[in-house]
Amino acid sequence: MALSDSIGDFLTRIRNAQLAMHRATRVLFSKMNSSILEILKEEGYILDYEKQVVDNLPSFIVKLKYYEKSPVISDIVRVSKPGCRRYSKYKDISKAYNGLGIFIISTPKGVMTDYNAHKLKVGGEVLCRVF
C-alpha cells in the first residue's frame, strides 16, 4: 500500500510513540524525513536518529527524548497537507507558541526552522509545527 502523505505518517509515528512512552520508533526513509529529523535533533526535540536497512527497506530509528518522564514533544502537527498546501512569505511567518515551538518550512534554500527562514528572508511551504 502506497502512502499518500509520508510526512504525515512520519509525524504520526513520532507522536504516537511519544504518547506510548517508547524509547525509540521506526519511521520511513526519505530525504525530507531526514531533513526534518536533523532539525528536530538540532533543536533538542529528539536524542538521535540512525538509518537502518531491514529486508532491503531503508528506514530511520528515532531515539525519542523525555524530560522528567514527560515527552519533550508535546505537540507535533502537520500544517501543509497534500489536499491543502500552506505557503508563507518570510514576513508572514509567525513564531510558533510565542517562540516556545518551531515551524519547519521547506524553502528553495532547503528545509529549515521558521527562525532561520525569517533570518534568511525566504518563505516556503510550512510543513509542520512542533512544540
Curated annotation (Swiss-Prot):
One of its GO terms (cellular component) is ribosome. Keywords: Ribonucleoprotein, Ribosomal protein, RNA-binding, rRNA-binding. Pfam families: Ribosomal_S8 (PF00410). One of its GO terms (molecular function) is rRNA binding. One of the primary rRNA binding proteins, it binds directly to 16S rRNA central domain where it helps coordinate assembly of the platform of the 30S subunit. HAMAP family: Ribosomal_uS8_B. Belongs to the universal ribosomal protein uS8 family. This is Small ribosomal subunit protein uS8. The lineage of its organism: Bacteria, Pseudomonadati, Pseudomonadota, Alphaproteobacteria, Rickettsiales.
